[in-house]
Amino acid sequence: MLRFLVLATLVLYGHSTRDFPETNARVVGGTEARKNPWPSQISLQYLSGGKWYHTCGGTLIRQNWVMTAAHCVDRKMTFRVVAGEHNLSQNDGTEQRVSVQKIVVHPYWNSNNVAAGYDIALLRLAQRVTLNNYVQLGVLPAAGTILANNNPCYITGWGMTKTNGQLAQALQQAYLPSVDYATCSSSSYWGSTVKSTMVCAGGDGIRSGCQGDSGGPLHCLVNGKYAVHGVTSFVSSLGCNVSRKPTVFTRVSAYISWINNVIASN
């Protein structure tokens, strides 16, 4: 049985073949991002005891829609989105805080079987954010786009900087080149845990996603332009930065029709 960890600040366990994926990820081996090279990145926060806490990342894809991981919004909580965020512990003067009005989770998502895929959700905001230098829409790939092996990509987020460590206060980024499906699904990597509707990146044992990065974007450079090709989903429960256990993302290009249909009908 393969153990994996979802990368929100809550842990889910899914089924696999050698060790469980964990869906609670933060950037390990990364560096602080400049303010703000990734303006589509948002912080998804929940209300508890009168205070707001970061739980996941996400991508602004419309002025009133955010894309994140389904496992980030499994629990019934009061959520808000903070766009234009850089340092969670201080007011940067660029933040826009907006309540989440509606949550649409992919209908095939099963929190008891993370490895089945469909770890994607859309959040409709109570109001539109204002676009500026610090808040921009993420560019999505064309439907069906498949990344080449070793394609340049960056993961971003406020997740833990090491396994069982602390959440980052400033937005982090780490270079995670893509790992093609044939390699990532081989027995020495993730095996059958990884599906064709997922994207793998990293796996060098140094840099990875970790708890708190879940739902956030994988930005990949294709034809000279960055687009959001992945939604951070899970890592190995053996640790965030385990060699040959790349961070696994929901492949955005597999869900373009679903995304468009949800937005059009809501």
Curated annotation (Swiss-Prot):
Q: Which GO terms describe its cellular component?
A: extracellular space
User: What EC designation does it have?
Assistant: 3.4.21.36
Quote the protein name from its UniProt record.
Chymotrypsin-like elastase family member 1
Quick one: where is this thing mainly located?
Answer: secreted
Q: Which pairs of positions does the record mark as disulfide bonds?
A: 56-72, 153-220, 184-200, 210-240
What role does it play?
A: Serine proteases that hydrolyze many proteins in addition to elastin.
List of catalytic residues: 71, 119, 214
Kindly list the cofactors needed.
Ca(2+)
Instruction: State which residues form the propeptide.
Output: 17-26
Limits of the Peptidase S1 domain:
27-264
Q: Which gene encodes it?
A: CELA1
Keywords for the protein's UniProt record, in alphabetical order: Calcium, Disulfide bond, Glycoprotein, Hydrolase, Metal-binding, Protease, Secreted, Serine protease, Signal, Zymogen
The residues that the database entry marks as glycosylated are 87, 241
**Record's superkingdom?**
Eukaryota
Q: GO molecular function, one example?
A: serine-type endopeptidase activity
InterPro entries from the entry?
Answer: Peptidase_S1_Elastase_sf (IPR050850), Peptidase_S1_PA (IPR009003), Peptidase_S1_PA_chymotrypsin (IPR043504), Peptidase_S1A (IPR001314), Trypsin_dom (IPR001254), TRYPSIN_HIS (IPR018114), TRYPSIN_SER (IPR033116)
Q: Report the record's Gene Ontology biological process terms.
A: proteolysis
Annotated compartments? Secreted
